[in-house]
Regions:
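Bacterial N-terminal signal peptides
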Residues: 22-33
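Low-complexity intrinsically disordered segments
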Residues: 4, 23-24, 288
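Mature extracytoplasmic/luminal segments of secretory-pathway proteins
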Residues: 3, 14, 31-33, 111
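Predominantly soluble domains enriched in secretory-pathway, periplasmic, or organellar proteins
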Residues: 36-344
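N-terminal secretory signal peptides that target proteins for export/translocation
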Residues: 1-19
Length: 344
């Protein structure tokens, strides 16, 4: 989902170049390294993080309470009452991480799980970018309960539950499909602005980030129609809900937009300094949590609408707060960390 060719290849070339195997190889390294650095943030502004004194910390200051090995590239997370589930598209499976034993247990094997995970109506819902369908599974055992012929539009398209339904964007043009959780059938298809992804349910509405339109789109489940649009930061992508608000991570400038879930009005734009592709945002433990490569954990205080802690270093890509801990994937390290983060 968010794997960087430049990161892995650059590391290989660095080792070879340091060994000075040949002038030609050194020149190749320099050319590719420069290209990768130019492309590493994909044309977005440079990540700077937050420079306020006392906010920034090194990831080396955190010691995991548990480390879960997950083969492949662990990515999307979903929380249940006693565990978390994590996808690994490259390994073609979804793994249950038991929050009591701190060990992985059940494994669901399916082709290229992607585009998020949702918990709702007694099930775990898994979009597949391989079989292009929606898989419904038991959240305790991982047993597959149903396969619904609706596929995600994008590997980062997102999925959510609410109003008796599962919602996911199924075409890049874009179309929001509503799947009835009682019948496992599509009961509505809703046209969205092109380039809209990552639905989330909050209040009485479904909210979707319009990545191309720089807006947060509101859908009314009672009518299955778009009923509002709130201008927010550039290239909005990932959403979470908490404290009566929808929080949006804007990839274009690395800010977080806070939108009132009742009125649809923009309440705050918070500088975070983490622009670029990838990343995620979550709410829990009274805080908003964001992650991107290089800045694995950013903590926002919703009472202040500002970043109060930010950790720099290796790790990151998907984040949740659950069972009294921060759960963080290390996409390139084939593991998930369970962390106790100190109070701000």
């Amino acid at each position: 989902m968010r794997i960087s060719f430049c990161i892995s290849f650059d590391r290989v070339l660095k080792v070879k170049c340091l060994a000075e195997e040949s002038l030609a190889l050194t020149m190749l390294f320099l050319a590719l390294s420069c290209f990768c650095r130019a492309q590493e943030n994909d044309g977005f502004p440079k990540k700077t993080g937050v420079t306020e004194p006392g906010v920034r910390h090194s990831m080396s200051e955190l010691s995991p309470d548990a480390v879960f090995p997950v083969s492949g590239h662990p990515d999307w997370l979903a929380v249940t009452d006693d565990a978390l589930w994590v996808t690994s598209s490259s390994a073609n499976h979804v793994v249950r991480l038991d929050a009591t034993t701190n060990k992985p247990d059940a494994v669901i094997t399916l082709e290229k799980p992607c585009s998020g995970l949702a918990i709702g109506y007694g099930s775990l819902w898994i979009p597949s970018c391989g079989s292009h369908d929606l898989v419904r599974a038991d959240p305790k055992t991982g047993a597959i309960q149903a396969r619904i012929p609706v596929g995600p539009a994008d590997s980062e398209g997102g999925i959510t539950s609410g109003a008796g339904s599962i919602w996911l964007v199924t075409s890049a043009s874009s179309e929001l499909d509503r799947v009835n959780a009682a019948t496992n059938t599509v009961e509505a298809r809703i046209e969205l602005p092109r380039g809209s992804f990552n639905p989330i349910f909050a209040g009485d509405s479904v909210w979707v980030a319009s990545n191309e339109g720089n807006a947060l789109v509101r859908v009314d489940p009672a009518t299955n129609k778009v009923v509002g649009s709130t201008p927010i930061g550039p290239k909005p992508r990932f959403l979470t809900v908490g404290e009566g608000s929808v929080w949006v991570l804007n990839q274009g400038d690395g800010t977080v937009s806070r939108v009132d879930a009742a009125t649809g009005k923009l309440r705050a734009t918070i500088p975070v300094g983490i622009p670029g592709l990838g990343g995620e945002i979550a709410f829990g433990g009274g805080s908003v949590w964001a992650t991107v490569f290089g800045y694995p954990i950013t903590r926002i205080d919703p009472a202040k609408n500002k970043v109060v802690q930010q950790w720099v270093g290796k790790g990151g890509d998907s984040i949740r707060y659950a069972h009294g801990s921060v759960w963080l994937t290390f996409l390139m390290g084939a593991k998930v960390w369970r962390l106790k983060v100190p109070a701000a």
